[in-house]
Amino acid sequence: MSIVKEQFFQRVEQHLHAIYQDVELPIAISELTEELITLILGDNPLRDPTPHTNRWDEQDVVLIAYGDSIINHEDSDLAVGTPLEAPLKTLHRFIKEQCDHQLNALHILPFYPYSSDEGFAVMNYAHVNEALGDWQDINAIAKDVKLMADLVINHCSSRSIWFENFLTDTHPGKDYFKTACLTDDLSQVVRPRTSPLLNTVTTTSGEKHVWCTFSHDQVDFDFENPEVLKEFVGIIRHYLDNGIRLFRLDAVAFLWKQLNTSCINLPQTHEVVRLLRTLIEHAEPSVVIITETNIPNQENLSYFGNANEAHAIYNFALPPLLLHTLLSGDSTALKHWMMSMPPAQNGTAYFNFIASHDGIGLRPIEGLLQPSEVASLVSTTMQFGGRVSMRTSHDGTHTPYELNIALFDALQGTHNGADKFGLERFLCAHAIMFAMEGIPGLYIHSLLGTTNDYERFDNSQHNRAINRHRWQESKLLAAIAEKYSHHHQVFNGVKQLLAVRKRQAAFHPNATQFTLHLGEGLFGFWRQSIDRQQSIFCIYNISSQPQSLTLADLNLINTQQWYELLSKTVLDEELKTMQLAPYQTLWLSNRA
């Protein structure tokens, strides 16, 4: 056995001992280790990963979309019925022909057969939903962009073959799902839904109560059974073989359940993430693991581990904080949060986003905003046509959990109501995200300036549907071509920001970041490239009033020429102050 393989074996074995230390296993840990290594490598050679390697740079921007976000359909007014081609082909063509090479990565939201929750109740992990396309379509996309896929690891569909086998006490699936007794004390369990946690089902061996963190159609796995772990390692190998290089671990914080605990962020959950990291990076070192943990900020940060868990974590506090900042015209909370965020170690990065297929989560800002500020966010969201999703707190009360609204509508005004600065405010939000430390993730409906889809909401009665519009391709192309439409202005404005961003070494996800103190109406930070050759001062007017910037407040080294990157202008050396229009952005750099 080579040194690399021996060390690999020992690390996997250590992870398994930590995970299953309180579980009586049917097989020896050493045997399980061998099986997992065989599954993850398949017919491929063992790789020796280099630790603390940044697998990203300033060129990386991830587009987030459903496989059928754009549909080629003969009816130009409706994105319904049978498409003229596989929607994955339509999405692929749109990226290649319309996005000017500004997007080099794509997160296709669950593209597997499913029974509910827009893909997150997976019926078969090994198949592509026939309504979207097939594995050939996935492979074709993976040849053009870095491809990100969801590993829906906490639960699967109640209509999956595994759960059907659970009901009939047959394999595989017989012991795959978490059960509990109605008499168990489950009062400490933390979850983001108001539905009953347990669902009673009838099996051939009698009545059982299965654990459902999210919905009764999404039944939680029991990872105390190592067969479940083996299934998922095999699934990961299958995805690797089909070109997936970024893995989003969906709802992973809830993975391990233990009575008399919160059943969230348990030590075994973190150890499973570390195990998957070890297995994957020895199979394909270029892979990036991103944990989707929509939880309070400090808990979210824990998924970095010691640079040995997730390569990247979602910056869940950013969307609600940035929304608060732009609706209130006050940068205080955003500034304090940014100052508190530790720089990501090499080999780790923040995954920044300000809109997604889900709503804008409120749990991540617990302790960051005052209750009155959260209440204002809820009120303004409703005023601008959005919806608010609730969760059940420990005391049984219902608490706002998520704001459901298209970002373009959410930023149509301030807490004082709608105004004329919606477009400027929207582009300012993206200019902030694109310049921050981390990898930017751009939701397709933010790229397109899509508004609230009330028809989709009315048809489904699911709050999240309001921000999950399906575009008909010809209608979309007409909208982004019409130069006076907000879709055209958003689409081209965002692409222009990205074109500038991708040329700046100081916007590397791991470049230095320092928060500036410029008063309530301005927000700013300084970025410096890893080689220390480029500095960029990123300044934003986050208010609806003009703001004055005193250049003496910045450390503009007077022996260097300074440039404003977005306007492509040279700063006058005699200039003392600059006036920023409402929601204007300045990127001041010592390199043009």
Positions of predicted regions on the chain:
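Active-site and adjacent substrate-binding regions of carbohydrate-active enzymes
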Residues: 2-592
